[in-house]
Amino acid sequence: MNEWTPIWVNLILILAVLFAFAAMLSWIERRLLGLWQDRYGPNRVGPFGVLQIVADSIKLLTKEDWIPPFADRAVFVLAPAIVAVTTLLAFAVVPIAPGIGVVDLNIGVLFFLAMSSLGVYSIVLGGWASNSKYPLLGGLRAAAQMLSYEVFMGLALMGVVMLAGSFNLRDIVAAQENLWFCIPQILGLATFAVAGIAEARRLPFDLPESENELVAGFHTEYSSMKFGLFFIGEYVGITLISAMIVTLFFGGWLGPVLPPLAWFLLKTFIVIICFVLLRAALPRPRYDQLMTYGWKVMLPVTLVNLLLTGAVVLSVA
């Protein structure tokens, strides 16, 4: 694609690939979890169970679209849409390859952080509008967790911004031509990855929807495609965090021999596999442990990383 390609062509193609990738991620995750846990994963619908995602989609689409009579109807319907829209908007600034991307913003990092922080409204509104105690508790947990870890995520990115000298994600990729930022920003990478898992509400940080405490958390009362939108938002979210890690710390599309698009997709897929492995390997912490870890460990580490990066940049300058 060149610079004259209409933006809507880029938009449609990226959305199609993103939804297909997120859908396949569901199948890949379940197959890998089955492999690592020494059991069968999906293996009945289609070869190797690959059509299980189609069966799940049909099941969700044919379920009754039920709204509890005690719920706040308008907000209840709006909440699932917010999580999907904000995640997709955050993905708009991710540069997939030269000439491939929805929009090239000079404030791409800030736009990503802004859209990511708006996702908490979906969870809080969904829990509140359900007018039920378990969704409300899940929404309150999500508000504290996501707002807290948004701080650490932003601080982790500032080291990368200081090294690249720009908030533009394409400039950040170009700045890694000689050295990927995963080496000088190893502390930033670690804190951003942990904060990203917490922001995406994935195991082991899925406290807002922990089944053994809150039934299903903030989406307990949801069914049909409203539940499906939360599900899609979660998988698109983990794809977004993986793509941002690749862009910020692993050189984006940069690499030898293979085309830039192939490098970007390969790196993103490897990061996603690492996140799935974390889900299989780590237990869920208590909620107080999660918050304590954030403010007593993550915050000091990000501040130390910021100070060290600033000192290096000033000394070189």
From Swiss-Prot:
The chain crosses the membrane at residues 7-27, 74-94, 107-127, 147-167, 179-199, 230-250, 257-277, 297-317. GO terms for biological process: aerobic respiration. It is a multi-pass membrane protein. GO terms for molecular function: NADH dehydrogenase activity; oxidoreductase activity, acting on NAD(P)H, quinone or similar compound as acceptor; quinone binding. NDH-1 shuttles electrons from NADH, via FMN and iron-sulfur (Fe-S) centers, to quinones in the respiratory chain. The immediate electron acceptor for the enzyme in this species is believed to be ubiquinone. Couples the redox reaction to proton translocation (for every two electrons transferred, four hydrogen ions are translocated across the cytoplasmic membrane), and thus conserves the redox energy in a proton gradient. This subunit may bind ubiquinone. HAMAP family: NDH1_NuoH. This is NADH-quinone oxidoreductase subunit H 1. It comes from Nitrosospira multiformis (strain ATCC 25196 / NCIMB 11849 / C 71).
